[in-house]
Amino acid sequence: MRIFNQTEIRIIGCLIEKEVTTPEQYPLTLNALTTACNQKSNRDPVTSMSDSDVLDSLNTLVSERVVTDETRGNSRVAKYQHRFCNTEFGSLKLSKQEMAVLCVLFLRGPQTPGELRTRTQRLCEFDNVAEVESVLTTLGLSEASPMVTKLEKEPGKREARYAHLFCGEVINDVTVVDKTNVTNHSNSTENDERITLLESEVAELKAEMAQLTQLVNDLLA
């Protein structure tokens, strides 16, 4: 399995996400892709990559055919799309749910099954958390190479987190917390997740408006 660096995996995650959520803007220009990489919503960590940072990694991914330049006709603006999975001659074939789970793990880092169910809503549908866990099990038992791993449960959390392995082995960063805070933290988890989802949806709408504005500017350039 190809091991990517953090910038490369952020680019791949953004291209997968935007292919589904904003198909009218896909493939993405360099400016739109940089904006997507640096979104404040649905990104952890939040980054401040330059166009040059993104382009350097894009050139590597294009040379390896993980990403392709889809510039057509007389267009002066390069546009990029991923070939990470489900290509005609590629070996990595993923279901819509599997691709959505990996996409969120690429963009947000380790997640619990409950968080994944919430945060994949714009990419696919899961009927329940058990369905997410089934997909994670499938990804973890891939015949070619495991694509996800289960981390140790964090103190105060009801669910263990899962991480992708496309950037190599994951060091489990379980945080030690004061036992007196565990109960309160556990009780507030569901409310925090609902608030986070609403904030994320508002921020994503703002980001998509910014990308649409950038697309119009690119077309008028």
From Swiss-Prot:
InterPro entries: DUF480, WH-like_DNA-bd_sf, WH_DNA-bd_sf. Pfam families: DUF480 (PF04337). It comes from Aliivibrio salmonicida (strain LFI1238) (Vibrio salmonicida (strain LFI1238)). This is UPF0502 protein VSAL_II0605. Gene3D superfamilies: Winged helix-like DNA-binding domain superfamily/Winged helix DNA-binding domain. Belongs to the UPF0502 family.
